[in-house]
Design a protein with these regions (language model features):
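Alpha-helix-loop-beta-strand connector modules within alpha/beta enzyme cores
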Residues: 66-85, 143-157, 184-188, 258-270
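Active-site acidic/histidine proton-transfer and metal-coordination neighborhood
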Residues: 77, 93-195
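Short, electropositive alpha-helical surface patch
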Residues: 99-112, 135-148, 177-186, 214-221, ...
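Conserved, mostly hydrophobic/aromatic
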Residues: 41, 86, 104, 115, ...
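N-terminal pre-domain/capping segments
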Residues: 1-87, 91-112
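Active-site beta-loop-alpha junctions enriched in small/polar residues
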Residues: 26-30, 54-56, 88-90, 128-130, ...
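Acidic/histidine-rich catalytic cores of soluble enzymes
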Residues: 49, 145-254
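Short, well-ordered coil/turn segments that N-cap beta-strands
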Residues: 17-23, 45-47, 77-83, 117-121, ...
Length: 302
């Protein structure tokens, strides 16, 4: 699949039609991907889902439940629900610690394999940081050495994209502003299986002001100028508890933070977001998630 194809391309003609921007949520899956995760998503009215396939704060690489995997995959296909996996937070290919890098390789390989098993379109991974006081160029060379081989392993038609998620700019972040993706993509040879997951809270906290009449569109223009058309595959739709440029990753419910509602509406009118799902990672449990999903749908449809 070429990078300029829609992230939702390939849906069969008998499946329900997709809205321009499916709106969904990260969902809990303890107890079963299908029996718990998709049930939660349906309760929200979610049109897209994101899941963990391992403890996000650990290195375990558990095997899946084949029955749950197949039921989840089949239901997502039948109902045209695009699914995504979020890799564990500990992954950092820029670490100065060899053990962390080795564990990062195995953890991400596991997430990519599990993504394929459940029919996920993409696996989201944070872009990491240059630890140990090392220069960014040294860390990016290490990213290339260890991450590019994992991308080259994605040889099946149903393998997921690897979606780089820039961070909020804390510490020695390798990638937070849109233009930071340029060296990152270059280090990975702009691999055809490489995409971007844009987190609105992160990019706002990193210094891109999404507010105002053209803030969201200018940010997306910069993204496209940096990585090219068709690379944006997923948006994490989160408001921010903190002001622009605060370098703090603290999510708020849609419209309840410093971003506000209007930028989310604007995001869903830019050419780069056509066909790109929005997934919330906001506070509030099921009730708060349902409210955020409904609010984003209204912003999209009105």
């Amino acid at each position: 699949m070429s990078p300029d194809q829609s992230p939702l391309a390939g849906a069969g003609p008998r499946r329900p039609p997709l809205p321009r921007n499916p709106v969904g949520s990260h969902v809990p899956v303890a107890g079963g991907l299908h029996s718990v995760g998709l049930s939660y998503a349906r309760d929200l009215g979610a049109e897209a889902v994101q899941v963990f396939v391992a403890n996000p704060r650990g290195w375990a690489t558990p095997t899946g439940n084949p029955a749950q995997d197949e039921a989840f995959r089949a239901a997502c296909a039948a109902e045209s629900i695009p699914a995504y996996v979020h890799a564990p937070y500990l992954i950092n290919f820029g670490s100065h610690t060899g053990a962390t890098v080795e564990r990062s390789v195995e953890s991400l390989r596991h997430s990519l394999r599990r993504g394929r098993e459940i029919g996920a379109l993409g696996v989201v991974v944070h872009t990491g940081s240059a630890t140990g006081g090392r220069d960014r160029s040294v860390a990016l060379a290490q990213v290339r050495e260890h991450l590019l081989p994992l991308l080259d392993e994605l040889t099946h038609d149903d393998d997921p994209f690897l979606l780089l998620e820039p961070t909020a700019g804390q510490g020695a972040s390798l990638c937070s502003r849109t233009w930071d993706l340029g060296p990152y993509f270059e280090a990975l040879d702009a691999h055809p299986r490489l995409g971007v997951c844009l987190d609105t809270c992160h990019v706002f906290a990193a210094g891109h002001d999404l507010t105002g009449p053209s803030g969201a569109h200018q940010t997306l223009d910069l993204l496209v100028d940096t990585v090219g058309e068709g690379r944006l595959k997923l948006i994490h739709a989160n408001d921010s508890l903190d002001v622009v440029g605060a370098h703090k990753d603290r999510h708020a419910n849609i419209g309840a933070g410093h971003i506000g509602e209007d930028p989310f509406r604007a995001l869903m009118t830019h050419p780069a977001t056509a066909g790109v799902p929005l997934v919330i990672e906001t506070p509030g449990g099921k009730e708060g998630h349902a409210t955020d999903v409904e609010r984003l749908k209204k912003l999209r449809d009105t």
